[in-house]
Regions:
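Metal-dependent phosphoesterase signature
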Residues: 60-98, 106
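Helix-loop "lid/cap" segments that line or gate small-molecule binding pockets
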Residues: 32-33, 52-67, 124, 156-157
Length: 221
């Protein structure tokens, strides 16, 4: 146990918490939407924040119809996303490295619980030079049920051998917050694309403006 408080671990979401990736995803989807005349694509993307690739496709097909060429459009969006990211367009959120360094210094266990596929997660964390901070990485293709179900957070806690009630979860999306809360963790919300609604205010233990504020909070515990 660290000397700061009774929590032993911090489990991070990735997209929108560690990387400013959701802003880039929205931007790339808007390019594809303008090309093909897809309406309300930002609204569709917001509905999919925090869930895995399989469920994202299901929601797009439900919204636009079973004949919607999702795989083709998603492929174009992904290609544009990765081209932009490779050119330095995928930025770390402010305060990430400072928070990770603080957690290591104070002997927290650190895990990742991301709905994104493992190959993508590991590639992005490696490129950013922060993968070695994480004791365990759990991804969307490693669990049966996606967020908002608690599976991914329960698996992460099990992998680092820490009880869920001894973990903080850092999330930005509603589905991610529901997942961590249902797993029995104290959730710190750092809003990204969506502000905290009444449900989030009820189930989060803190709502913070940035990861710098997370570090400040833990320093005071």
């Amino acid at each position: 146990m660290n000397a700061v408080n009774d929590k032993e671990a911090v489990i991070f979401d990735m997209d929108g918490v560690i990387f400013d990736s959701e802003t880039l995803v929205f931007r790339c989807w808007n390019v594809v939407a303008e090309k093909y005349g897809i309406k309300n694509v930002e609204e569709a993307c917001r509905e999919c924040l925090g869930i895995n690739a399989v469920e994202t496709k299901e929601r797009f097909l439900k919204r636009y119809g079973e004949d919607f060429p999702y795989d083709e459009y998603k492929g174009e969006m992904s290609e544009l996303f990765h081209e932009t990211a490779a050119d330095g367009g995928l930025e770390l959120k402010p305060g990430v490295t400072e928070l990770l360094a603080f957690l290591k210094e104070h002997h927290y266990k650190i895990a990742l619980a991301s709905s994104t596929r493992k190959v993508v997660v590991e590639s992005q964390l490696t490129a950013a030079g922060i993968i070695d901070y994480f004791d365990k990485i759990i991804c969307g293709d490693m669990v049966k049920k996606s967020k908002p179900e608690p599976d991914i957070y329960l698996t992460a806690a099990e992998e680092i051998n820490v009880s869920p009630n001894k973990c903080y979860a850092i999330e930005d999306s509603y589905n991610g917050i529901r997942s961590a809360y249902r797993a029995g963790m104290d959730v710190l919300m750092v809003p990204d694309m969506l502000p905290a609604n009444e449900e989030m205010k009820e189930i989060c233990c803190n709502i913070l403006d940035s990861l710098f504020q997370v570090t400040d909070l833990l320093q005071k515990k």
